[in-house]
Amino acid sequence: MGYISWLGKPDTEDSVLTLLLRQAGAVFYVKTSVPQTLMVCETVNNMIGRTVNPRNKNWSCGGSSGGEGAMVGIRGGIIGVGTDVSSFPFHVSN
């Protein structure tokens, strides 16, 4: 969620998605960044600052799941799982 008060306080249990991926053999090796409260159009938080587009440092990587998008953009993993709050781009593309 990007809250600085949660820094260094990991959850004691895995989420359902994490559990399913782990059972399927996934290896978690990195964390990606999110904007504070997730509902912002740009990925900026007080822990690591601004996450930029990996192909053009002058552009944003987007908000909500921007860190995940940046990771997928540099082929840093074989799967990216992001959140979806308003589906605005989805509605426009239909």
Regions found by a protein language model. Name each.
Residues 87, 91-94:
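Structural signature of FAD isoalloxazine-binding scaffolds in flavoprotein oxidoreductases
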Residues 1-86:
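Gly/Ser-rich catalytic/binding loops embedded in alpha/beta enzyme cores
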